[in-house]
């Protein structure tokens, strides 16, 4: 019994003793009390520290700043968004006021529609924002009249202003008389449709209309998805300023005609003769609006305007260049075949146009470096040599007569050339000759072309310009076997002789005190009729004495009795030319000994002219003096 009592007491004691759960709860409770004590202590400490800071001025300032930061941080985000939305709405309203299509709407548009209309409006104005393309742009240094004359001169036409409502001509320049043969007073105030071809009136009315200035795209509201109805009413005041126009039309041309009365058919003839001809006019311009007061119009005389802007077409009319009147005889005039070449002062080709290949069959590189005299017919050399001298001495253009030019297959083609020389403005010397060569057809050659003035009759050949030996037979031109005849062998030297002649005249005239500042273009080297050379030989008009122009003779008196000149002051004072007989002699009796003798004489002459040698012995000269 005693043992049972001990077991029961132990069990009760175990049951009454605290378990692990009670220990955990007791521990948590103790820790919670400690934490609460710590929090209360920390808050109390912070409050005490803040109370101490309030007493300190520096701490009070920090406390105020801290409170301000807390207040700004607590500001509602909705207020910031509200201010942003207000700014965006104000900008969209301002944009809608700038777009004309938005202003014309009867109700307020949503934001997306306003933005889309603004984009469409910017697309229509693309390319017209450049200030240099605006209609109001004008250089500051030009007046209105000067600018108008410059535009008319550049356009080669006439300026006209036409009202878009009735087609009334409000202004036309005086240059319209050159094209239409109507004066300025005849056209101003009249209807443009009265001067148009009946079949072109509808086309011009379409160009004057303003149908294309209305919006072509249908606007859709972003909210409802329905098309937006615009309140824009088409009218003259809604024309798009700067709308370009370009069209062709036929206008009446008041050409004077002689009336021929026929008794048999009086009615038909009068109708045909009185019928006015038409010319094709290319009109380019733009539509523009002006106030009526700016145009100088009286509003009382125009009751339909009602104070609105006057819409006009400002354009320049030019005669269509492709419309060429055909000649009366029925022949079709085509553009003449021509090519341009440039020559050195001695006649050698330095540039040839590519069109020469189709005319002459030569490639440009085949002609470069060769003399033009090698291709001239021998009967035309005299005339062309005289033209060569003239073009080197004058500033004017020289037009040659018709001459024959040898082409690649050996035959000849008839050409006519315009020559002019280019003078270097600094050195005052001729640098090259420009030649425009035109092919002359057979019918033009027979009937004559009024565009090319004919020069005086030239000699048949160069030999007719030169003095032949007294009583001697006429010299025959040498021919080369295998080469077609017609050209002169060795004719390339002629251009070099003429160039040396002109240069020598320029040097002698330029060295004299009385002719300082003279240029080769102002020298007249053609001697008077029957002029005598220093040696006593007679020079025909346009002829040349048989003396070498390259022979620069000494200024001292020559003691050699074989030398024909005794007065050294008159040496080369006149026109020293080289005869073509010298070329023929050189061609016929050319030998190494003669060439060496000629070179020796030339070198002696050069030394004598420079004062380096004594009298020159002409006994070995192969040419007769």
Swiss-Prot record:
Region (Disordered): 1-60, 454-491, 510-594
Alphabetized Pfam families for the sequence: HLH, PAS, PAS_11
Site (Important for interaction with CLOCK): 125
Keywords attached to this entry: Acetylation, Activator, Biological rhythms, Cytoplasm, DNA-binding, Isopeptide bond, Nucleus, Phosphoprotein, Repeat, Transcription, Transcription regulation, Ubl conjugation
Modified residues (Phosphothreonine): 21
Low complexity biased stretches: 17-32, 510-520
Residue intervals of the PAS domain: 143-215, 325-395
Annotated site residue numbers, Interaction with E-box DNA: 77, 80-81, 85
A cellular-component GO term for this protein: transcription regulator complex
Keyword field contains Transcription regulation: yes
InterPro entries hit by this protein: bHLH_dom, Circadian_TF, HLH_DNA-bd_sf, Nuc_translocat, PAC, PAS, PAS-like_dom_sf, PAS_fold
UniProt domain bHLH: residue ranges: 72-125
Residues where N6-acetyllysine is found: 537
Motif annotated as Nuclear export signal 2, chain positions: 360-368
Ranges of residues in domain PAC: 400-443
Cross-link Glycyl lysine isopeptide (Lys-Gly) (interchain with G-Cter in SUMO2) per UniProt, renumbered positions: 259
Cell location: Nucleus; Cytoplasm; Nucleus, PML body
Ranges spanned by the short sequence motif Nuclear export signal 1, renumbered to the chain: 142-152
Motif (Nuclear localization signal): 36-41
Covalent cross-link Glycyl lysine isopeptide (Lys-Gly) (interchain with G-Cter in SUMO2 and SUMO3), where: 252
Keyword Metal-binding: no
Function field: Transcriptional activator which forms a core component of the circadian clock. The circadian clock, an internal time-keeping system, regulates various physiological processes through the generation of approximately 24 hour circadian rhythms in gene expression, which are translated into rhythms in metabolism and behavior. It is derived from the Latin roots 'circa' (about) and 'diem' (day) and acts as an important regulator of a wide array of physiological functions including metabolism, sleep, body temperature, blood pressure, endocrine, immune, cardiovascular, and renal function.
Protein name: Basic helix-loop-helix ARNT-like protein 1
Source organism of the structure: Pongo abelii (Sumatran orangutan)
């Amino acid at each position: 019994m005693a043992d049972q009592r001990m077991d029961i007491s132990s069990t009760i004691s175990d049951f009454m003793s605290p378990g692990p759960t009670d220990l955990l709860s007791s521990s948590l409770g103790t820790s919670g009390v400690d934490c609460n004590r710590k929090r209360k202590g920390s808050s109390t400490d912070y409050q005490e520290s803040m109370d101490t800071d309030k007493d300190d001025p520096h701490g009070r300032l920090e406390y105020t700043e801290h409170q301000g930061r807390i207040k700004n941080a607590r500001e509602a985000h909705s207020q910031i968004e509200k201010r942003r939305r207000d700014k965006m709405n104000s900008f969209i309203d301002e944009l809608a006021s700038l777009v004309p299509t938005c202003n014309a709407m009867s109700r307020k548009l949503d934001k997306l529609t306003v933005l889309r209309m603004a984009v469409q409006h910017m697309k229509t104005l693309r390319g017209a924002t450049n200030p240099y393309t605006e209609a109001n742009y004008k250089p500051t240094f030009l007046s209105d009249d000067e600018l108008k004359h410059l535009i008319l001169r550049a356009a080669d036409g006439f300026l006209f202003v036409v009202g878009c409502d009735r087609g009334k001509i409000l202004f036309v320049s005086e240059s319209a008389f050159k094209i239409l043969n109507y004066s300025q007073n005849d056209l101003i105030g009249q209807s443009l449709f009265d001067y148009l071809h009946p079949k072109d009136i509808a086309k011009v009315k379409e160009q004057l209309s303003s149908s294309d200035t209305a919006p072509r795209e249908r606007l859709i509201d972003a909210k409802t998805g329905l098309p937006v109805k615009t309140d824009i009413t088409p009218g003259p005041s809604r024309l798009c300023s700067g709308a370009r126009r370009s069209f062709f039309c036929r206008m009446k041309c008041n050409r004077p005609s002689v009336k021929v009365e026929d008794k048999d058919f009086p009615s038909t003839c009068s109708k045909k003769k009185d019928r006015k001809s038409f010319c094709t006019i290319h009109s380019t311009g733009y539509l523009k609006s002006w106030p009526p007061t700016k145009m100088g119009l009286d509003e009382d005389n125009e009751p339909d305007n009602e104070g609105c802007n006057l819409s006009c077409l400002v354009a320049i009319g030019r005669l269509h260049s492709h419309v060429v009147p055909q000649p009366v005889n029925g022949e079709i005039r085509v553009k003449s075949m021509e090519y341009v070449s440039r020559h050195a002062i001695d006649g050698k080709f330095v540039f040839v146009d590519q069109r020469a290949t189709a005319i002459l069959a030569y490639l440009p590189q085949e002609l470069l470096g060769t003399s033009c005299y090698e291709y001239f017919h021998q009967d035309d050399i005299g005339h062309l040599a005289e033209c060569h001298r003239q073009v080197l001495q004058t500033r004017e253009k020289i037009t040659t007569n018709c001459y024959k030019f040898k082409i690649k297959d050996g035959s000849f083609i008839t050409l006519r050339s315009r020559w002019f020389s280019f003078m270097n403005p600094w050195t005052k010397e001729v640098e090259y000759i420009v030649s425009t060569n035109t092919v002359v057809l057979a019918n033009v050659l027979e009937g004559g072309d009024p565009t090319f003035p004919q020069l005086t009759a030239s000699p048949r050949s160069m030999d007719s310009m030169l003095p032949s030996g007294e009583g001697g037979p006429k010299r025959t031109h040498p021919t080369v076997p295998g080469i077609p005849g017609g050209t002169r062998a060795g004719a390339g030297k002629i251009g070099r002789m003429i160039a040396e002649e002109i240069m020598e005249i320029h040097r002698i005239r330029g060295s004299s005190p009385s002719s300082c500042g003279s240029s080769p273009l102002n020298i007249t080297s053609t001697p008077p009729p029957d002029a005598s050379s220093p040696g006593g030989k007679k020079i025909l008009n346009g002829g040349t004495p048989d003396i070498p122009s390259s022979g620069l003779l000494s200024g001292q008196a020559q003691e050699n009795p074989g030398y024909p000149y005794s007065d050294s002051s008159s040496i080369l004072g006149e026109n020293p030319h080289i005869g073509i007989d010298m070329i023929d002699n050189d061609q016929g009796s050319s030998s190494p000994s003669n060439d060496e003798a000629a070179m020796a004489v030339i070198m002696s002459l050069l030394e004598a002219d420079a004062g380096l040698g004594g009298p020159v012995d002409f006994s070995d000269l192969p040419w007769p003096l």
